[in-house]
Amino acid sequence: MDYFLKIDMGVPLVSIITVCFNSEKTIQKTIQSLLNQSVTGFEYILVDGKSKDSTIEIIKSFENKFKEKGISYKWISEKDTGIYNAFNKGINLSKGKWISFLGSDDIYLKTAIEM
């Protein structure tokens, strides 16, 4: 494992997983859409395939913002071994009762996580 960060804010109801690789053009809007959620009872997990662009720097730039909102934020960056392996890594890191996947080039609307 090359790098791993975990900011744990308790047991979440929902785990949201994003798998990414060289996603600097889209990942900021993806992550921001989770910060804009109307609820905070979730955790966000990003699994990066050792991006060669600025994806990791963008992911790092959100660490304190999630901490300030009390949202668990975890990310890992390891050599890419395939998308399904990356999804499994995210699932293994998750603690939520439910799991949802969000593409690195997609966003959630503000109320997407509301129950």
List the predicted regions and their residue ranges.
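Nucleotide-sugar donor-binding/catalytic module of glycosyltransferases
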Residues: 1-115
